[in-house]
């Protein structure tokens, strides 16, 4: 969906929907859905296609998963291209779901929490999780749409109604909200500081980090924290972009990064 690249004839792309998302089944399922199993799924894809080493590309939660995958399987990773860094630490999660985004978009936040009684608002994540995993289907869908719409509204630098409305579609909203809340309430099934404490495992891997200056979903401090501990990685902060991968400046730098990687690290037949 993004602009064609001169490197498109160099790469064989393997795209997948993680457990419970997109076209994966069962839809929005939480059983056996954790980070360890996602890493195992990625490895199964790699071995199924007889890939020895590959360039791993991921954004937002995909950047989290890419980093953890690379730290567990560094010998199979040629390089990393990461967008919208999400380190998934407790304060990173709290920024969006408790006490950060509410200060930037108070009107969107009021819409978001309107379905939660005042006496439960001291822990918004738990309140939503309880509804998203409860048996009341009406409450579940209302929570899913509210959860997903907030992210859709906050993901672009400029308001984009069409972009945000996609997040409210039932199929998308239910999977996004249920699975995100499941991971976040469990701190993404990661140990405290796991990503930062294991940078030495991937320090040698060529890496480009692309992050929007005005990213309100995963604020740019997360990319800066990562790059400060990993000076070998290249950090590109995009001056006129938010979180979404569809932001023009983000698209440009991601395509440039894939082209540059192909030129520098891949041999053409």
Language model features: what each stretch is:
Residues 75-128:
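A catalytic-pocket lid/entrance helix-loop region that shapes and gates access to the active site
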Residues 36-54:
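Conserved acidic catalytic loop of the alpha/beta-hydrolase fold
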Residues 233-269:
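Catalytic active-site module of serine/aspartate enzymes centered on a nucleophile-bearing elbow/loop
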Residues 202-203, 209-211:
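Short beta-strand/loop motif that positions the catalytic acidic residue
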């Amino acid at each position: 969906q993004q602009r064609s690249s001169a490197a498109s004839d160099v790469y064989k792309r393997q795209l997948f929907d993680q457990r419970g998302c997109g076209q994966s089944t069962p839809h929005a399922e939480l059983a056996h859905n954790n980070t360890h199993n996602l890493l195992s799924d990625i490895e199964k894809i790699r071995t199924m296609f007889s890939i020895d080493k590959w360039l791993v590309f991921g954004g937002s939660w995909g950047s989290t998963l890419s980093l953890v995958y690379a730290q567990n399987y560094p010998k199979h990773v040629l390089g990393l291209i990461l967008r919208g860094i999400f380190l998934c630490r407790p304060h990173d999660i709290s920024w969006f779901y408790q006490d950060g985004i509410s200060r930037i978009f108070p009107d969107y936040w009021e819409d978001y929490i309107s379905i939660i009684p005042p006496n439960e608002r001291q822990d918004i994540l738990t309140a939503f999780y309880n509804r998203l995993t409860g048996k009341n289907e009406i409450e579940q869908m209302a929570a899913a749409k509210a959860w997903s719409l907030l992210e859709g509204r906050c993901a672009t630098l400029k308001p984009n109604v069409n972009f945000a409305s996609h997040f409210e579609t039932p199929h998308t909203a239910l999977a996004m909200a249920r699975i995100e809340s499941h991971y976040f309430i469990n701190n993404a099934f990661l140990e405290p500081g796991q990503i930062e404490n294991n940078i030495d495992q991937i320090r040698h891997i060529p890496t480009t980090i692309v992050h929007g200056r005005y990213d309100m979903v995963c604020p740019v401090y997360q990319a800066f924290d990562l790059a400060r501990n990993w000076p070998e990685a290249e950090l590109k902060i995009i001056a006129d972009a938010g979180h979404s991968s569809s932001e023009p400046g983000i698209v440009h730098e991601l395509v440039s990064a894939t082209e540059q990687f192909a030129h520098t690290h891949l041999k053409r037949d």
